[in-house]
C-alpha cells in the first residue's frame, strides 16, 4: 500500500515540477512525507486491530497511509515556516494545476479546475502567468470578489467562451 502511494507521490512530484517549469523555471515546489517509518502490511493489520474500538468511536481510522504528514517546500525552504502569503497562494494554485494535470493523465478525463479567489495575494505578473498556465486547462471555474481584478489579469468578460456570473448581496438595515 505504501509502495503504491510512494509511486503515485513520485509521479505527482514530477507533474508539480513540470507545472513549475511551465510557470517559471526559478520556482520549484516539492512535497515530501515526514512519516519516519513505513510499516509492513502485518504491522498495519496489527495496529488496525489494536485501534478498532477507538476508530469506531471516533468514526475514522487512526492508522494508515492517509495519516502521513507532508511538507511543501518552496524554493527549497519549508513553505509553512518561510513562505509569504503570496508564496502560499502561488504554491497552492500551482499544486492545484499539477493535480488537475495529474488526474487528467491518470484517468484520461479532464476534470473541472476550481480556483477560489485566484488573484488574491498575487501581484499582476504572477496572476497573469497563472492565468496563461490554466488558459488551456479546459473548464475552469474561478471565483473572485472584484470583476475589475479579473479584467486586469487578461480575462475578457465579453469573450463568448467566458461566463461571468455576478452575485449581489441584498443588504437590509
Regions found by a protein language model. Give the residues of each.
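Conserved NTPase motor "head" modules and their coupling/switch loops across ABC/AAA+ ATPases, GTPases
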Residues: 3-112, 121-125, 129-141, 148-155, ...
Amino acid at each position: 500500500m505504501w509502495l503504491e502511494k510512494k509511486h503515485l507521490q513520485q509521479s505527482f512530484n514530477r507533474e508539480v515540477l513540470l507545472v513549475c517549469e511551465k510557470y517559471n523555471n526559478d520556482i520549484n515546489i516539492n512535497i515530501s512525507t515526514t512519516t519516519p517509518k513505513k510499516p509492513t502490511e502485518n504491522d498495519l493489520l496489527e495496529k488496525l486491530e489494536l485501534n478498532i474500538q477507538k476508530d469506531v468511536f471516533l468514526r475514522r481510522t487512526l492508522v494508515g497511509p492517509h495519516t502521513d504528514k507532508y511538507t511543501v517546500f518552496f524554493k527549497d525552504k519549508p513553505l509553512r515556516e518561510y513562505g509569504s502569503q503570496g508564496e502560499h497562494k502561488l504554491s497552492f494554485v500551482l499544486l492545484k494545476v499539477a493535480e488537475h494535470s495529474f488526474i487528467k493523465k491518470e484517468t484520461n478525463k479532464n476534470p473541472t479546475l476550481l480556483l477560489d479567489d485566484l488573484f488574491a495575494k498575487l501581484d499582476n505578473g504572477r496572476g497573469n502567468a497563472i492565468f496563461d498556465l490554466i488558459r488551456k486547462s479546459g473548464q475552469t471555474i474561478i471565483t473572485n470578489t472584484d470583476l475589475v481584478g479579473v479584467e486586469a489579469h487578461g480575462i475578457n468578460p465579453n469573450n463568448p467562451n467566458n461566463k461571468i456570473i455576478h452575485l449581489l448581496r441584498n443588504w437590509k438595515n
